[in-house]
Amino acid sequence: VLSAPSVHDPYYKSAFQRIVDFQIDYAKSILGNDNVVILVDKDTKPYFTGKVPEDILLVDDVRDIWMRDFTTVNPMQPVQFTYTWASMTQKQSKEVQKSFSQFADRYQIHRAKTDLMLDGGNFVDDYAGRVITTTRFMQDNELSYSEAKQKLKNTLGAREVAILEPDEEVLAHSDGMVSWVDQNTLLVNDYSKIPSFRTTVMDELKASFPTAKIVEVPVEYKTNPKGEWDGFESACGVNLNATVTHNNIYVPTFNMAHDQQALMIIKQNTFKKIIPINTESVCPMGGSVRCLTWQVTGDNAVKLIQAARDR
């Protein structure tokens, strides 16, 4: 599920058409592989009409594009955490999550809820009880390392939990660092340029997931020109911010030199189909493919697919 920017939202005004074009292209790449629904408000809908099938557009009002962060985690057993405000004011983040909650209630989206604070982007799991977050989760909830692990195990029924030092301090999300591509295969950015940090990350992953196969993937970082999306780290160059479904992996690419090697390593380590998604137009804003995607399955998915078709 994608959430279109509103034509009335001043924050996205400068990038509005770029985001819309990206979402259209991304949706077209999903069609035929997985189901997709795009949430649009009525004044924004004309920008999508005729460019994607009409029956994937659902007119509603969800207040932000970064759907990963304020929705639910784990499509198999959805849990809605309390959205933190790393990227906006507390008032804004409450409004954004409220718009989602009202939307989810309208369509009777089944989910558990918790008061624990977490952005969905700081939650990477294999859908089968192995979970990765960063120390930001500890700070936001004023928990020690062992308390944080226990809370996540209790709240999610998780078996194994890793809590990483984040590789950037703004959002401190784990989904720019790691990706579970198969039941037992975990990909992690190659941090060998910062050996001490690499050791810290690898030690925590190996200790937390003793039986998992852990594979490093090349990563390059870009910095935004001054004045462009100030306060956010660019997500350009991070191929692991991928959307992983039952049969497919939508991998962001950036027209950068390391893209092909990263894609090759991902392909070699999964039986799933790899679908590259050019993300150059949106990654400077601080997120890419996974950040822009909310994943639902089963009855929850059927309700939304049907609602879009019925409109």
Where is each model-derived feature located?
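Histidine/cysteine-enriched polar flanking segments
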Residues: 1-311
